[in-house]
Regions:
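Hydrophobic/aromatic residue at the end of a short beta strand that borders the catalytic acidic motif
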Residues: 22-25, 41, 77
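Active-site PLP attachment segment
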Residues: 60-99, 103, 121-124
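Hydrophobic residues in well-ordered beta-strands that form the structural core
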Residues: 41-43, 86
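PLP-dependent aminotransferase class I/II
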Residues: 1-10, 14-18, 23-32, 36, ...
Length: 170
């Protein structure tokens, strides 16, 4: 439990929006809150990859987005991995450096703490092939979701089913 005194000491810098079930967040409302409070937004598109919001593809809804290639995600490979998306050159340079152990502009100088963030070649090969069928997989998922929705509705139960938010595709 955070006391009122401790709340006054907390400084927020980020909002992390998380899309779920191949559905993006209502990013307009999130960006409005972020802009009003001078906060950055990181869109976690790991579960929403392949969806769209107001004709913008998930992974491209704000300045910084990320996705995961974990097998259970919409665009999964057979191991771990992920991707970072940005149109901001400064964010790109920081992320690029961080994924190469923090390497700076000189090969043997390190500007920050980093890690090895490169995906291995086997996972990359799997993703290249999966990208070729990704759209058809999304269509099949939507068809199956609609089928299950009809089946649950036909049961006449009080089960609450997920709805796609206004302006979004799933």
């Amino acid at each position: 439990c955070i006391t009122e005194e401790k709340k006054k000491l907390i400084t927020f810098k980020w909002i992390i929006s998380v899309g779920l079930f191949v559905q993006p967040c209502d990013i307009d409302n999130i960006l409005e809150i972020a802009n009003a409070n001078k906060l950055w937004v990181l869109d976690d598109a790991a579960q929403s990859f392949g969806s769209s919001y107001k004709n913008k593809i998930s992974g491209n809804l704000c300045d910084i987005s990320a996705t995961s290639f974990f097998p259970a995600k919409p665009l999964g490979c057979y191991g771990d991995g992920g991707a970072f998306f940005t149109n901001n050159e400064n964010y790109y340079k920081i992320a690029y450096s961080a994924h190469l152990h923090g390497m700076g502009s000189n090969k043997y100088e390190y500007d920050r703490i980093g890690m090895n963030g490169r995906i291995d070649t086997i996972q990359a090969a799997i993703l290249i092939e999966k990208l070729k069928i990704f759209k058809s997989e999304l269509i099949k998922r939507s068809e199956l979701a609609e089928y299950y929705k009809r089946q649950f509705l036909d049961l006449g139960t009080n089960i609450k089913l997920p709805k796609v938010i206004s302006g979004a595709t799933s």
